[in-house]
Design a protein with these regions (language model features):
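Feature marking well-ordered beta-strand scaffolds used for ligand recognition
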Residues: 1-288
């Protein structure tokens, strides 16, 4: 890709996750799930809103809940790679949630290059597989049927457990990262995934990616994660019903990660992006 251009901007208050299929963008907005037609990015169209899909964070103090807020000023600060988390608010000027969602700016270019399906990374809460959207709330996996984009419907809700954070599909399975462990579900039946196994760890934030019967999980400390561990775990999935830890590697404050052909890319807080050769799981090599 050469010379990428900013051709538009959609103002979606409090949005943290998106997925795209057939030029329909699905996103969270506060507690709601919304769908926007982006066939013409200069003239996007609001399609539908499903209310109260997500929970609003109650803050980092377990003994207090957040019941509201006021925006008093705008503060711009640099953010260290990997420090963002889905359980906190960043207050910026924004339109009220009941106002229509419209492009803020765009170029005259009418073309678009959006793909036909959504692809999520290690921090994604959304995943589109065929005609279904999988969405994680803090305790549930919710499945939506996208065959009718004008009126997509909830197909199933599967209660998983507390602290769900990320979803990663691989080889007809779903790998769910939570603050207490990794859950594995068989997804051959797209509307009724079946539980296969879990791998437990201490309470910590937990993105996950998978390749070649191995899962790569980062654990990090932080105010929202309430954990004390900062490490990369490599997990053996040869027996998918009994995942086993191969080895843990200490890190600074790891967050998102990606893998391709045994090369692992890992965002490690203030130390930035790190690249590892993970051909040998028990002896990974730092590349740069």
């Amino acid at each position: 890709i050469k010379n990428p251009k900013n051709i538009g901007f959609l103002r979606i208050p409090m949005s943290g996750d998106i997925a795209i299929k057939d030029n329909i963008l699905y996103a969270d907005m506060f507690k709601d799930l919304i769908a926007i037609d982006i066939n013409d990015i200069t003239n996007s169209k609001f399609l539908r809103k499903n209310d109260n899909v997500f929970e609003i964070s109650n803050g980092n103090n377990e003994e207090k809940i957040q019941i509201g807020y006021r925006v008093k000023e705008t503060i711009y600060e640099p953010v260290v790679c990997g420090t963002g988390n889905s359980n906190s608010f960043i207050l910026l000027p924004m339109q009220p949630p009941n106002e229509p969602i419209t492009p803020s700016s765009s170029s005259p270019n009418q073309g678009n290059t959006y793909g036909k399906t959504g692809i999520g990374g290690s921090l994604a809460r959304f995943s589109i597989i065929e005609d279904y959207l999988y969405v994680l709330s803090s305790i549930d996996m919710i499945i939506y049927n996208l065959k009718n984009t004008q009126d997509f419907q909830k197909e199933n809700t599967i209660k998983i457990g507390n602290g769900l954070e990320t979803i990663f599909p691989y080889d007809e399975k779903l790998f769910l990262g939570s603050q207490t462990g990794m859950y594995v579900y068989d997804n051959k039946n797209k509307t009724k995934p079946e539980f296969l196994s879990t791998f437990q760890h201490i309470k910590s934030c937990d993105p996950v990616v998978v390749e070649n019967k191995k899962a790569y999980v980062t654990l990090r400390s932080g105010s929202s994660c309430r954990g004390g561990s900062n490490e990369l775990d490599i997990i053996d999935l040869e027996d998918i019903k009994n995942p086993k830890l191969i080895k843990s590697y200490p890190m600074k404050n790891p967050s998102g990660l990606a893998i391709k052909d045994n090369i692992l890319y890992l965002c490690d807080g203030s130390e930035g992006l790190k690249i590892f050769d993970v051909s040998k799981s028990d002896d990974i090599k730092f590349i740069k």
